Amino acid sequence: MHTTVTRFAASAVAALLLLIAGAKANACTTAIVSARASSTGRPMIWKQRDADNVRNTLAHVKGERYSYTGIFADTDTGHRKTYGGINEAGFAIANNLSYNLRPDDTGTQNGLLMSRALGICESLEDFENMLREGTGLEISANFAVIDAHGGAAYFEAWDHGYTRYDVPEGGVLYRTNFSLSGRENEGGGYARYEAISRIMEKRPRGGYSPEFFLDAARNFHHGFSGKDALKGNALVYDNHLIPRPWSASSVIIEGVTQAQRPDAGMMWFVPGYPPCSYAVAAWVAAGDNLPATVSGDAPANALAVELMHKVHPFFQNEEGAEYLDVKAVKKILPVVRKAEKAELREARQTDGFNPAEVLGYNKACEERFEAFKQKVTR
């Protein structure tokens, strides 16, 4: 089911369309999983973030009404623009830029809107009211939203209107860089949309899990050809795959059920290029008690950027930046997956409401990262 609300008539067809399918950055992939479709009974949002600034950090922010944990660019020291997060009321949001909604450009203030929403919203209805009343911001995005009341929906929104698509009970939805309500055959991310469609069709028997999306973040199948880039050892053009040279992070946000405390949400955050980095846990209830590897200067992100350059040997060359050294990434992936398996195991044994346990997890997380760094760089 979807609902369209337009506050003003849209302008004529675009004179300028920026960053379409061949774009170098700002081309994310997202999915929403309803509570009944997940392996944990919690609703989830997944976001593979692509950006020109590939350095991210986690931070816990005190909003106008609610505190929240979110992803920020390392240059955003004031934490004004989040690219995905969850608050203490169980409200979570992430986005894809959409390139077929606005008539002239892409809308550059989506991060400001998401920070504002995380600070004041408890429900999908709160967020919808924000959009209906007008935000005063230049936006153009597919906003993935879940709440603690069982709500889950995409809002395909721009400055002067939005269309809401509710996730079917027991179902899933996903988006790339075009909106279903936008201008037909415009926008970007069509190859990735085909790829994530094929991935999501293979629904696991026990439901979608964080591990499912961590695998998706490192899935090298081309959406149009179906070809798996990892089958060979040559250089391959990877700009239209889910993991792109501009992939800056991946995150799985686990929301809460109506039987849980609203601040029971958590995030599995992969800093930097996902094939060269692994997921680390952060709990909303833990506040600013975050792992040092992914907050502040985020050394795990810095390492992932270094490794991304290693597997893209011509990255500094404009023509060569989007060519992946398959042989090199295949050497790194097993080390990443082994480290991630251990990290998930340790996190799941940690009580996110217990400050001492979280502190212990964070300290051990640093030690595990140092061991990973030694293995992956030698």
Predicted features and spans:
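N-terminal secretory signal peptides that target proteins for export/translocation
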Residues: 1-6
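C-terminal, well-structured catalytic/ligand-binding subdomain of enzymes
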Residues: 27-85, 89-119, 141, 147-378
